[in-house]
C-alpha cells in the first residue's frame, strides 16, 4: 500500500512538472503572433516584387521580339521587290497572246501585268511605294431577253448564240443598250486582235476599256443561263413552301386531334377527371379530398357511385358555354327553352366565379327573362337530388362509422354547398334583373299601368307629378306580356317555395349554433334556444315537428326533415332571394294597392335623381319601393 502511494505521489509530481512546462504565458503567445505577422508581411512584399520583375522582363522580351519581327518583314519586302524588278527587266514589257507573236515594248520602263480572260494581259498600276494596285472590275454588258420575243433552241445558246441574226436580238439590245452594235463572232474576234495590236504600240487607256467592252459581249449567254437558274430556284422555293405549309397543316390537325381526344377522355374517363371538371375541390380543405375514397380498391362499394350520380348530367350536351350564350342572344322563343336546359346543365360544370361571369354575359340577351326561371328550376331540382344523396351518405356512415365514410360525407356536403351557392347567385341575379327592368321603365316614362291607359307628367321643379287616366282595376306589368306569363308560372309553385323558405330559416338558426356537417357535439338546449329565436313568419307546425325530431335524437339534425335545411346558406337574406311565389305575389299586391291609392289621389311624385321612389299619400303614410 505504501508503495502504491509512493508511485502515485511521483506521478503527480511529474504531472505538475509537465503542466508547468506546457503552460505558455500569454505574453509569449502575443509576441509569437506579432513575429509571425511580420514574417508573413515580408514574404508578401517579396512575392509582389518578384512578380513585378517577372512581368517587366516578359514585357521587354515581347517588345524586343516585335522589333526583330518588324525588321525581318521589311527585309523580306525589300528582297521581294528586288527580285520582281530583276524579273521585269529580263522579260521586258511584252503582252503575250495565245497564238500571236510577242511585240517588244518601246517604253523605257516595264510595268507589271495581270492576265485577263481569253489570254489577254493588262498592265497593272503601282502606288507610290511600289505596291500593285488592283484594277477596278469592268462592267459587263448583259442582253435582256423579253418574254414577248421567244428564242428558238434556247438549250443550244452556249454554242449558237452568236450565229443568230441581228434581227432576232437587235430590238431587245437596242431597247436596253442602244449604243451597242451586235457583231458576228468573226467580226468580234477581228476587233479584239486589232485592239491588241494597237495596245502593243500605244499606251492609251481607252484602248483597254474598249477591248474589255468588246470582250464582255462574249458573256451575254451567261445572262440567259442565270435567268433560267433563277426561274428554277423560284420554282423549287415555291414547291418547298407548299410542302412546309402541308407539314404545318398536318401538325395543326394532329394537335386538334389530340385536343379532341383529351376532351373525350375527360368526358368518358376516370372519376378523378370528372371531379376535376366540377372544380369543387376549391371549396374543400386538403384533408377532405386527399384520401383513399377515390382509389381503385373501393370500386366494388356501392357508395362509390355517389360522385357519378352528382355528375350524371355533365354529358348531356357537347356545345360550349360561349356558343350557348351567343345562340341565346339571337334565338327565337321556341328555341330558348332548349338553350336554357343546356345552360342549366352547364352550370354544374362551372365554379362560382365562372357562373357570375356567365350571368353577366347573358345580361345583354333579350331572352334573359325566360332563361333565369328555367335555370332556377333546374338548379333547384339538382340541389334536391344532391340532398337525397347526402342523406344516403349519412345512413351509410351510421352503418359504417369509419374515417372513409366521414371524408365521403364531407365531400358531398361541400359539393352541396357549392351547388346551392350557385342557386343563390342565380336568384339574386334574377332579382337584380327585375329591378333594372323596373328602373328602366320608370326612367324612360313607360306606361306601367297597362297598355290601354294614358300617362302624362307635370314637371314642377325636382319632382314630376304623374296623372293616370284609365280603368281603376288595372295592375302594373314588369316588362311585357311574356314577363307577365312568367310571373304567373312562378306563382303556381308558391307552396313548394314556401316550404323551402321555412327550411332555410331553420337551417340558418341551427347553423348559427354549430356546424352540423363537421361536429356532433350540439346539445339539445342550444338547438332549442336557436329554434325559439326564429322569425315569426315560420309556421308553428314546422317548428313543433322539428323540435320533436330533435328531442328524439340530437343526431337527427343531420338527416330527416332537417336535411331540407341543407339546401340553404348561412345568410338570412337568401330567404328573400329564394322567394319566387307567395312573397313576390304579396309584394306585387302591396305595390299595386299603393299605386292604386296614389292614382285615386291623382298624385304620384317621383324623385328625379334617386333609385328609391317614395309615395307620399294624403294620410301621411310612407312606403318605400326599391327599384
UniProtKB/Swiss-Prot annotation:
The organism's taxonomy opens as: Bacteria, Pseudomonadati, Pseudomonadota, Alphaproteobacteria, Rickettsiales
State the protein's name: Uncharacterized protein RP017
Map out region (Disordered) in residue numbers: 1-22, 578-606
Which residues lie in Basic and acidic residues bias regions?
1-20
State where composition is biased (Acidic residues): 582-592
